[in-house]
Amino acid sequence: MVRRAPGASLALLLWVTAVSCSPAGPGAATARRQDEAFSTARLTSRCLSLQITRISAFFKHFQDNGSLAWCQNYKQCSKCLEPCKESWDLKRNHCQSFCEPLFPKKNYECLTSCEFLKYILSVKQGDCPAPEKASGFAAACFESCEADSECSGVKKCCSNGCGHTCQVPKNLYKGVPLKPRKELKFIELQSGDLEVKWSSKFNISIEPVIYVVQRRWNQGIHPSEDDATNWQTVAQTTDERVQLSDIRASRWYQFRVAAVNVHGTRGFTAPSKHFRSSKDPSAPPAPSNIRIANISANNDGTVNVMITWDLPEEPDIPVHHYKVFWSWTYSKYVIPAKKKRRKITDGPQNYVVLEGLQPNSNYNVELQAVTRWGQIRLKSAKVSLHFSTTQDNRNNNEQTSVEKPPKGVVDPYPTFQRRKPTRFLKIGTPFYQDNQLQVKIYWKKSGINMNQFQVHSLLESCTHNDTKGLEKVTELTYENYMILKDLSFSCKYKVTVLPAKSKSRFKAESIFFVTPPCSTFKEKTHKHINCAAEEVPVLPKVLAKPENLSASFIVQEGNITGHFSWKISKAVLHQPMTGFQVTWAEVTTESRQNSLPNSIISQSQILPADHYVLTVPNLRPSMLYRLEVQVLTTGGEGPATIKLFRTPDLPPFLPHRPHLKHHPHRYKPPPEKY
């Protein structure tokens, strides 16, 4: 779990979710997870880059973790981030199927972002070399690959003029940020959290840089890379530090960091030195959900009872063994300890069979977990279970803890016979209605007996001074949703939903959200909304617009390079100009069923204010391209100037040599990413 770093006003870390679920071996699965972490970071960088002028209006430096928080709560930017939030097999499903249920009306940002993510998941960094440059095995005339994923390492599936082979790309790291410095600094805070810090080398990237942080660990007296877990992504952040709260004593941790932007990455730093917490490990948690799994009768009239429980998820030290005590009881008065019987089970085992119990009798069972830390034994609190071997009462078993009051009726079925409930707590897009800011929160019901819910909303903080004293509101509902009303602008809220019946075994679920600034609604709805409480002023409108868009093309060695230029009139510049945002896309001729325009994913680049020319290599021949240029100023972006250009045909190529393997379609190298 990641907590807010001290001193950061708006800290947010984006957790990575899996985007593909194709089966593979352990090594391939690890490589796939790494590629997906990089891909989602590239997508995040792209989304922040597209909103860079709006971000700069709120933050002095867009390379700030607050920009991620802003992006998640700004409507257009949050739509752009949506594909990397959800677990979705983008390789097998259409982006339209993903985005339209989330945004039925305006889903352009989600769709283009989804298409971009699909593209970078399938196409590796770098450009294919010219076909005539292939040599050795790479020049063999047969189809040895169809996609980049079939090639090892950084190699790409490229044409050699008579086939496709895996080749080392050119321009592998063009526009890609440098690796962070390999020295990582660890600070163990009094709270037990661990702060990991790093520093970056000179950054050649104008786009926002996302840092992907991974860790692995081993358990034992000494650090060991051979016994360590696989690398796992713990966070993505634009800051040069991360604060982790789930650090366990007795574990040896290693970390590594990669710098990623929209163009790609140079990979991770070397593994850090090992870190182990200085605090002593905690005793194991008390066993949970102890219950009867089975009762069976023996030929001699005695009864065997199987007791089962849930294993702890992640104790500081793995459980070495469990102690099980049981005795006959009368009216829940326990027999003296010297008459108790005892068994010991191994730590990985979550059941025990009590043999030879008397029928029609009451029994009490106590269970305790034990771990070993050197020569010290750490013991959990005991939990107890009262049950009867009477046939009619076998489902009426009560579980209690020695240190806690009874918890009610125990589920008589083992874990593998029950389906654990899952609920999804989600926040809709805030809206302004009836002169007040509102938001809809909804969830999935998990049981037929869960008819009424308590909804607690807590105002935690605001960017302006009007915090209203951290107010808390509690409401009841019979529905699986609730609309929270009379919210404040630019404020952070915590919402907790739980069943109204206190005896339910389902735990409460919480979610945080930040309301947008007042100016967002005032600009869109033109309603009379009082925004005096907000400190962020409404930016003046930018009128500057690029003029005389023109294009020239150079054909060399089978590649088409486009040079796009424009002019700007200084007379209409009322704010200092910071640069240009240039977006281009390949336009198709087929019609589409969704709301996307007839183009593939758009690609963008931010240019400095003194650059009036953009060079784009690897354009496709005889293809229509859409060019869009906007002026960026300190007051925001100006209107876009749009023009269509068609690339020239390629000259006749070398005679086609025979294939050893035929495919109905040819692989076409995609345009270079910017």
Swiss-Prot record:
Protein name listed in UniProt: Anosmin-1
Residues in WAP domain copies: 121-170
UniProt entry keywords in alphabetical sequence: Cell adhesion, Disulfide bond, Glycoprotein, Protease inhibitor, Repeat, Serine protease inhibitor, Signal
Renumbered residue ranges of the record's region Disordered: 388-413, 655-674
Signal peptide extent: 1-21
Predominant place of localization: other
UniProt subcellular location: Cell surface
Pfam families per UniProt: Cys_box, fn3, WAP
Gene Ontology process terms (BP): cell adhesion; neuron differentiation
GO cellular component: cell surface; extracellular region
Annotated function: May be an adhesion-like molecule with anti-protease activity.
Glycosylation sites: 65, 203, 294, 465, 548, 559
Top-level lineage group: Eukaryota
Biased composition (Basic residues): 656-668
Keyword match Glycoprotein: yes
Disulfide bonds: 47-71, 80-99, 84-95, 110-114
Polar residues bias: start-end ranges: 388-402
